[in-house]
Regions:
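Long, amphipathic alpha-helical regulatory blocks in the mid-to-C-terminal portion
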Residues: 1-20, 37, 68-72, 105, ...
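Short amphipathic alpha-helical segments embedded in low-complexity Lys/Glu-rich regions
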Residues: 21-27, 220, 268-276
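Fungal transcription factor middle regulatory core
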Residues: 23, 29-141
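Juxtamembrane/interfacial segments around transmembrane helices
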Residues: 26-30, 86-88, 214-221, 279-284
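Intrinsically disordered or highly flexible coil/loop and linker segments, enriched in small
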Residues: 44-47, 51, 105-119, 145-156, ...
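Eukaryote-biased recognition of C-terminal alpha-helical segments
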Residues: 173, 235, 242, 258-326
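Intrinsically disordered, low-complexity transcriptional activation domains
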Residues: 220, 306-395
Length: 395
């Protein structure tokens, strides 16, 4: 149905400014809003379906929606309303669209979605020939100056806009970092690995803020659609390789905080493919830290964080239940966890029209993790295994 809607929209010309110029200001603005909502939703669905080509591309010229209130628009108007210099009803839509408009022209995004389209991006895009890392810094400053500085953090819509922006930019930086370093012929330095962990931690911190605040309660249906699993893989694989790195202590703390707000589905379905995959990666990483602790004599390193204690407890519960039921579904030892079918990794992320974050695109992140160990094809990634019908209607 979404594909049909996209094709109808293109036939109507709502992706083209030349076609939109033939309509009244109100009609043109409504069409822009519709096009961008379709594009962002289609991009996320493409990620979840492991489909490489997304509608978010530099092949059309529809402008982002105007930063105006709905009351500023009327059928009688002959000219578009003046753009507001403060927060408006359309704030969240406008900011999301401006971020995505940047990304669809970015080389780090097109490298993963459709490299052939890089040739049609203007050479002067994104502040000239500066690095894309610097361009992302400039984008964040622009968004802050144009929109976020007018926001009230206690307002629900404004809070969502602020932290969605932070989360989106963190994911963009994470992808840009891997674009620069994944295929290098020389091994990554500790500084580069620390930078990757710091970016992954920032993704989880933003995600935790969004999921844990009462101000975002009515947006949970949307937040749960964007789970930052690549950040977990980045962190856990690095912690397995470098259990005593300078970012390790902070990483375990940040993962514990995010786990408390994110993994609500584990108590309902501990036999899910996701639980098995995540549990194995987590406990392997912690085992490496325990080995490093015993070898180095630092007992503080072996104090299990809340996330490890919780997962171990849940594994023990599942093992006990399995024994009681006289089944072989899930053994006590983590090495007994059955994981043996192909894994569509593109569905794991992240990030609202944020580009393709499929883990097959991150061979260096995966390291020694065998991507064929997992079978997540049956997982409802929209709600991480939580039945949408169980949500509070008040959300």
């Amino acid at each position: 149905m979404l594909g049909i809607a996209i094709r109808i929209a293109q036939r109507m010309g709502i992706h083209s400014e030349s076609a939109l110029s033939k309509h009244s200001p109100l009609e043109a603005e409504l069409r822009r809003r519709l096009w961008w909502s379709l594009v962002l939703f289609d991009t996320r669905m493409s990620e979840m379906a492991d489909h490489k080509t997304a509608t978010l591309a530099p092949t059309w010229d529809c402008k982002i929606p105007l930063n105006v209130n709905d009351s500023d628009l009327s059928p009688e108007m002959k000219e578009p309303p003046a753009v507001q210099g403060n927060s408006t009803d359309a704030l969240f839509v406008v900011v999301r669209s401006e971020l995505a408009d940047f990304v669809r022209h970015a080389a780090f995004y097109l490298d993963f979605t459709n490299p052939a389209l890089k040739s049609i991006v203007k050479p002067g895009q994104h502040e000239g020939l500066v690095s894309e890392a610097a361009a992302l810094e400039n984008l964040e400053k622009t968004i802050d100056d144009k929109y976020l500085k007018f926001c009230d953090p206690e307002n629900q819509l404004h809070f969502m806009t602020i932290w969605w922006t932070r989360s989106y930019l963190a994911k963009c930086r994470f992808l840009e970092h891997h674009t620069r370093h994944t295929n290098l012929s020389v091994p990554l330095t500790d500084a580069q690995r620390d930078a990757a962990i710091a970016l992954a931690c920032r993704m989880l911190e933003c995600d935790t803020r969004l999921r844990s605040s009462s101000l975002s309660k009515r947006f949970q249906w949307m937040i749960y659609l964007y789970f930052p699993f690549p950040a977990y893989i980045q962190i856990l694989q690095d912690l397995r390789r470098r259990p005593g790195s300078k970012e390790a202590e902070r990483a375990w703390e940040i993962m514990s905080d995010n786990y408390d707000t994110t993994f609500v589905f584990i108590n309902k379905d501990s036999d899910s493919p996701f639980f098995k995959a995540f549990t194995r990666m987590l406990l392997d990483a912690w085992e490496a830290r325990e080995v490093a602790s015993s070898q180095g004599g630092d007992l503080k390193l072996s104090i299990a964080p809340p996330i490890v204690l919780s997962v171990r407890h849940r594994v023990a519960q599942v093992a006990q239940n399995a024994q009681t039921a006289d089944t072989q579904q899930f053994g006590m030892g983590i090495n007994d966890v059955p994981m043996s079918m192909p894994m569509p990794m593109g569905s794991m992320h992240n990030m609202s029209g944020q580009g393709r974050y499929g883990m097959e695109l991150y061979p260096d992140v995966l390291g020694q993790i065998d991507v064929n160990l997992f079978d997540l094809s049956a997982m409802d990634w929209g709600f991480q295994g939580v039945d949408p019908g169980s949500w509070d209607p008040g959300l």
